[in-house]
């Protein structure tokens, strides 16, 4: 809390807050809990369209899938905790987002894990990577919620740090929606789940400031302890309680603990709450009321129920062997009152906890984009280097640790353009996340647009029409003028792109102060998207049959700024790829039409690594080769063969299809060219009638599957 905020609190309260009140206010006025540096700008994001049932403002968003089915979706970050204690930090990140979905009344059915680390050449970064993956795997597997996708990236700006974002979706009938706020006084507040300990105390405060170089030792107590077995019981008990129709409000205890959950639940509609802190079951001896009120111990839920329904609801908790306690009640007067052994120890206007003034920091623009000469590297050398980059290689080592098929809904598995989950006998839900901090570093506006565009292309590539988006915005300190400017530009880019596609953001998260030892991370907006697909139309990236034609949709430009090629060869400048929204929409609609008309056998969007990597991914996925002519790729004039292959221009797809469908497909697209054919086993790139690359599929597979050897396994 800043000095001017402490002064304002004293003025509004008319006195100094006591120790307990001050601790609660520090939690609620933290950046992590209040969004005081971002709230103004988040209002620019579109939050409504025909699919949205419930937009931002509660624990998760709700999207209409059909008349009988709603999808609940949310995304959260657990960056600081995972950088300090990667296993526990990542595991509790999973637990927290699962409870966010659960407390809307939905059964969690799938997770995505967009995760980022420093270069794997350093032992500390490998340690963070391996234990974050293990934390996600262990927790998700034990609660029976599959991790079905995500993205994994390594970047120099994340040295000794990690970004752990987790998205979750849940399934429910629309009439089962439970809100996170009460609409009447006299309700009992029932705390259910784990006992309260000292873990996670000041967790949100710790997440609202930069980490020091010694954070691993200094801040370990701020990281919560995971208990997936209790979480599994909480999932089943909560859903059973919700199905009685007698749960009036529901919140999980996440950041800010009991203070945050109970004050938000009571205060949103102008009610107050009385809390009896001494009734809270304690895991550790001699806990004081301040510790109890702000502890962030995991696997705890807060239910609001009427007195006459208490017995019915608590019998459900007892059936699952979950401890429960009535810790308070809602009151008519808008105050937040805490008792300890019959002594009143805190008494605040409830809006003082939630009504945190906006902070608008200085914003200073920067311009580091600069066109540069692409180095003269042989295509063969470039391909070897890019294909074996940790950012490009197969991430099977990660997702093979996840039980991605538990619950039996997974139709398309990890490693493709998007995962697809079966929702009913006719339709599936596509789910994917994307972000590229290298683009955002060069141009935060266009970097943000690119994340949205890639999500839409990924969804279209599997045959899905986009429904809604969620966003997770990872930034360094907003007190840095350049960082705050990049955040504002990011919001503008996210807004413009979503509006162009007719999409809304239904939930999201902002994570500031991501830096270690005063080293800021790159701007890292992550966007996750949902799409609806007919099961019979699901399309995959793998080449199917020898002799099929291969074509490119879209134009390739000299847009290598932030590309994997430039990164590998140490080029930090260049022009970041631009999103031509009209062209992007046309090509997406064209792809969806071609899929619906059953004209194409394989579709893959072109993104990181450019055309060269996209072709190789299609070949490896289908266990086929190809022969393509670089000169036939639709490209702006003056591009070298190297630039054509490794540019990361947006709006592009690769497709394969039977030759008999060529004329019908050509009629759909403006920017389209056949560049080659699917072959048996060889991967051949030609230029000026010469083979510039002739490689065996087995050699390429060995490079593409080299992550275990990079990790020293």
Swiss-Prot record:
SUPFAM superfamilies: PurM C-terminal domain-like (SSF56042), PurM N-terminal domain-like (SSF55326). It is an enzyme of class 6 (ligase). Its main location: cytoplasm. Mg(2+) 1 binds at residues 76, 509. GO terms for cellular component: cytoplasm. GO terms for molecular function: ATP binding; magnesium ion binding; phosphoribosylformylglycinamidine synthase activity. GO terms for biological process: 'de novo' IMP biosynthetic process. It is found in: Cytoplasm. It catalyses: N(2)-formyl-N(1)-(5-phospho-beta-D-ribosyl)glycinamide + L-glutamine + ATP + H2O = 2-formamido-N(1)-(5-O-phospho-beta-D-ribosyl)acetamidine + L-glutamate + ADP + phosphate + H(+). Pathway: Purine metabolism; IMP biosynthesis via de novo pathway; 5-amino-1-(5-phospho-D-ribosyl)imidazole from N(2)-formyl-N(1)-(5-phospho-D-ribosyl)glycinamide: step 1/2. Coiled coil: none annotated. The active site is at residues 32, 78. Substrate binds at residues 77-80, 99, 224, 296-298, 511. Keywords: ATP-binding, Cytoplasm, Ligase, Magnesium, Metal-binding, Nucleotide-binding, Purine biosynthesis. It holds the Pfam family FGAR-AT_linker. Mg(2+) 2 binds at residues 100, 252. Belongs to the FGAMS family. This is Phosphoribosylformylglycinamidine synthase subunit PurL. The gene is purL.
